[in-house]
Curated annotation (Swiss-Prot):
Belongs to the UPF0213 family. It comes from Haloquadratum walsbyi (strain DSM 16790 / HBSQ001). InterPro entries: GIY-YIG_endonuc (IPR000305), GIY-YIG_endonuc_sf (IPR035901), UPF0213_domain (IPR050190). Coiled coil: none annotated. This is UPF0213 protein HQ_3675A. CDD domains: GIY-YIG_UPF0213. Gene3D superfamilies: GIY-YIG endonuclease. It comes from the Archaea. Residues 3-78 form the GIY-YIG domain.
Length: 89
């Protein structure tokens, strides 16, 4: 069982960026691409994962999601360009 919590950013087909929370990044991206994800992404498929971060607790992940959602597009793009820290838990 996966005990980690993730915040992720996907780039939509219209080049917009969507930030979300999940416990399974691969499943969530598949859901977005199948039209079963957030209402925002349904008309903007396909989406591509550009960034994710891993957390030990749901509250930490949701706090980070809220923080990233307040970022400008430029700051979100910077996160995507920096990549994902694969050494996270």
């Amino acid at each position: 069982m996966n005990d980690y919590h993730y915040v992720y950013i996907v780039e939509c087909s219209d080049e917009s960026l969507y930030t979300g929370y999940t416990t399974d990044v691969e499943r969530r991206v598949r859901e977005h691409n199948a039209g079963e994800g957030a209402k925002y992404t349904r008309g903007r498929t396909p989406v591509q994962l550009v960034h994710f971060e891993c957390f030990d607790t749901r509250s930490a992940a949701l706090s980070r999601e809220h923080e990233i959602k307040s970022y400008t597009r430029e700051k979100k793009q910077q996160l995507a360009e920096e990549g994902t820290d694969i050494n996270q838990p």
